[in-house]
Amino acid sequence: MPKRLDINTILVIGSGPIVIGQAAEFDYSGTQACQSLKEEGYKVILVNSNPATIMTDTATADKVYIEPLTLEFVSRIIRKERPDAILPTLGGQTGLNMAVELAKSGVLEECGVEILGTKLSAIEQAEDRDLFRTLMQDLNEPTPPSEIIHNLDEAYGFVNEIGYPVIVRPAFTLGGTGGGICHNEEELIEIVTSGLKHSPVTQCLLEKSIAGCKEIEYEVMRDSNDNAIVVCNMENIDPVGVHTGDSIVVAPSQTLSDREYQMLRNTSLRIIRALGIEGGCNVQLALDPYSFQYYVIEVNPRVSRSSALASKATGYPIAKLAAKIAVGLTLDEIVNPVTQKTYACFEPALDYVVSKIPRWPFDKFESANRTLGTQMKATGEVMSIGRNLEESLLKAVRSLELGIYHLELDHLKELDKETMKKRIIKADDERLFIVAEAIRQGVTKEEINEWCEMDFFFLQKVENIVNMEREVKANVGNMEVLQTAKEMGFSDHYIAAAWNKTEREIYDMRKENNMTPVFKMVDTCAAEFESATPYYYSTYADENESIVTDRKSVVVLGSGPIRIGQGVEFDYATVHSVWAIKEAGYEAIIINNNPETVSTDFSISDKLYFEPLTIEDVMHIIDLEKPEGVIVQFGGQTAINLAAKLEEHGVKILGTSLEDLDRAEDRDKFEAALTKLGIPQPVGKTATTVEQAVAIAEEIGYPVLVRPSYVLGGRAMEIVYRQEELLHYMKNAVKVHADHPVLIDRYMVGKEIEVDAISDGENVFIPGIMEHIERAGVHSGDSIGVYPPQSLSEKLKEQIIEHTIALGKGLNIVGLLNIQFVVFKDQVYVIEVNPRASRTVPFLSKITGVPMANVATKVILGQDLVEQGYGTGYHPEEKEVYVKAPVFSFAKLRSVDTTLGPEMKSTGEVMGKDLTLEKALYKGLVASGINIPTHGSVIITVADKDKEEAMEIAKRFHEIGYNLLATAGTAQSLAEQNIPVQVVNKIDSEEYNLLDIIRQGKAQFVINTLTKGKQPARDGFRIRRESVENGVACLTSLDTTRAILRVLESMTFSAHSMKEITQTKRHEVVHA
């Protein structure tokens, strides 16, 4: 059927900020969909709140709205733009929920807007647990025994009938939010209560646990002609019981017989047809390993995380084709963009194995509960491709960027059998490593299978790796063993350690013996047809399929998996850099390993290598391609960390030199550079012993900011206010010695300013200056940023501009630089300089219209700023106000403290823009998920040092009609200031207390700056966690609180009695 001509304008709904459960995969799918619809001649309008994406670039759609994804704002856009249709299936759970809300509100009917791709009835049938169960019964498809419940009593009824364990699945939620497995009554009460709270329709499905079954996924496509195909089927190495986003996944499935494969394939196709989905759909199934009994777990009637993985695993662009199907085209009319010869109705075939390993944030949150269950915890993932599972798995392990090069962790070697058993049964982020350790220690595959029901096939693969380790260690210098180890994916790093050599020696040894990998093409058809895609992976085989052209080329290193501190912003910069390289006439080559991102879409670069970002894997590509050089400044810390090793291999680093990168990163060299330039910085020193640290802190005065010199991105940073806190930090957070010194700086309680600039070594251009609402001490990624600055004097602005220009020139920066300043007592100090792209590049690029990554790349390639139409100086400020607000995923990470500090905790960001700061702040806060009611109650529990400041805040809340609640100490301070307050019991009281108020939803805000320690038992910690679990905005920074007050005050009319007004005026006259 040809495309529809009765519609002209389509509104695409994005997925909003990155949170756990919904990451960069929707930037990839949304970008593809918008381009796909524009190709077909439709006018595309996009609404999304996330400025860090390629999707929200003005070139992606005909009109781009960066606005909150709420009913209020999306309805306004629909009424203004009057689209013919909306496409919500590419915006993740957010997009689907928005479509349901828009339909129920009547705005779609009022404006005559049609839903494309998946009908509203299909969304509700797949997402509403009751309707889905009924549909499965109608199709005679088995589901686990289950019951829909709306309260705890109904849950008890089901458990009494079926017994424990049971799985709780809340309706219409993302990444299993609020769900879990209950083994007893205590867990049932906790998880069901949480699930009902998180479900927008207060509904959960309780089902008998089928944990232990194999978990299999089918990614399917269907068009309006009822053509339906399987794009990819995938198998979770972890059995049912661990969320698929937290499971290690392989494609294609490895342990299914043909009969099982066909049985589950037919079921998947039957379900997509019954739902009437036109586009992509993900079906999750459970298979009993000992019979042909299977169960349908759930269906995602949209493009999902798994579809991004399936697209990159097969090369078949699901989102692009789903968009074309949504406008009426059929699979037999659409040409497969990979082969450019076959049609999209051909099912992809794979002649390689793909592995996906999740990237968890536990390196950031050491106190987090690492146990994996039905609620997702990973922030991102890596993917790798190999000719066998062992190779694929080991390549994925070293892609994780945790400093791990093999399936072994030193700290696990000490574990005894009983501890290993417990951890393998329970499942956490290290389970596969523990399985390998257990096999090393002689535990049998039968025992491990009994503990965790992982399939024998996968256990055998792990055993093959362990056996090969023994071979390697027993045959030092043996080339045949080395060849076999390399074919199994062993790294030079591992072999070097086993053979007591350096990694470089192993690399040279292989080159001398012609032992180098070849590159194979990902072509969707197992080489059955010729392919036109430049998409490659390495393996140790015979024929190389990556043909080197005679064009000059440049390699860009990507930023690897999405994690806290290194998000989609770096992928944005990478993609823009690649486009600039192509514009400059070079061949652009990208190396990355994240299946969720736009950068790993094969249509972006001239060549895509899907490989780990280690020196070994990167050098294989450089040895083949022989590029002009490598750009490292767009891939975050991942790429910067490779610069020194690349230079050792004789590779040219393009842009800022390694020496100058080091000058910005090395403490002593940086201090010397600042002194030479006459730029002030906070007083600080380096300690290599605990005694030294104590002496330095005494000398420069508390509070001090302490951090290790060898970790970046705010990890293990803390502000300490007295000696006992410093000693606690030195003992628990770092291991200090001569090689690992600790940096101790005077902590200045001032205003933080962030600047991004582009330098060509001679000229320094500053697109924008941002002011942080939270004072210095809160990580810049967790602060609310405002552009243009609202409270900086012209004099201070000039100082900042002068310092930025001096640093750009003085540090010989070629490309981007990011500087953080603190304004303290009307003086500007430099806190740090990052000689690379920062997370604010997409935000400032969109606001100012300066394509920063593009301009910086052209500078790196030799075109100076003046040639590009920019010179030295500050870009004229925009008239509107723009706010960048952080978004957190605390609800997914139990036992993580929500207090803001120098260590970054946010997973994503949103933008609010308007004519005034108050309106922009309102949009930013609402988009980030903070509800802003104009009245209600606020709980205030603050540390003694904050009491004075909190009084002014409390007074302002009272003025706008809020009811104030506080525990005895704070309440007394408020009463002394004649501020009305209701006293509530502390949390250790047996009677109705502060936590009960939070649980019952009787407070709209909690202001809490108590006990900023990391002990979960502390009062402050428990109050903050309870707020998160119950969806109450918990404010741990008084600056953030003031920002919210500004918004509330702007929304509230003043209500003063006439007497108060006359008294005030009389007072002014008296003191005039």
Swiss-Prot record:
Residues engaged in binding Mg(2+) 4: 832, 834
Molecular function per GO: ATP binding; carbamoyl-phosphate synthase (ammonia) activity; carbamoyl-phosphate synthase (glutamine-hydrolyzing) activity; metal ion binding
Pathway(s) served: Amino-acid biosynthesis; L-arginine biosynthesis; carbamoyl phosphate from bicarbonate: step 1/1; Pyrimidine metabolism; UMP biosynthesis via de novo pathway; (S)-dihydroorotate from bicarbonate: step 1/3
PROSITE patterns: ATP_GRASP (PS50975), CPSASE_1 (PS00866), CPSASE_2 (PS00867), MGS (PS51855)
InterPro entries named in the record: ATP-grasp (IPR011761), ATP_grasp_subdomain_1 (IPR013815), CarbamoylP_synth_lsu (IPR006275), CarbamoylP_synth_lsu_oligo (IPR005480), CarbamoylP_synth_lsu_oligo_sf (IPR036897), CbamoylP_synth_lsu-like_ATP-bd (IPR005479), CbamoylP_synth_lsu_CPSase_dom (IPR005483), MGS-like_dom (IPR011607)
Residues binding Mg(2+) 2, per UniProt: 298, 300
GO BP term (any one): glutamine metabolic process
Catalyzed reactions per annotation: hydrogencarbonate + L-glutamine + 2 ATP + H2O = carbamoyl phosphate + L-glutamate + 2 ADP + phosphate + 2 H(+)
Cofactor: Mg(2+); Mn(2+)
Binding site for Mg(2+) 3: 820, 832
Residues noted as binding Mg(2+) 1 in the record, renumbered to the chain: 284, 298
Residues that bind Mn(2+) 2: 298, 300
Residues that hold Mn(2+) 4 according to the record: 832, 834
Family: Belongs to the CarB family.
Name the record gives this protein: Carbamoyl phosphate synthase large chain
Gene source species: Bacillus cereus (strain ZK / E33L)
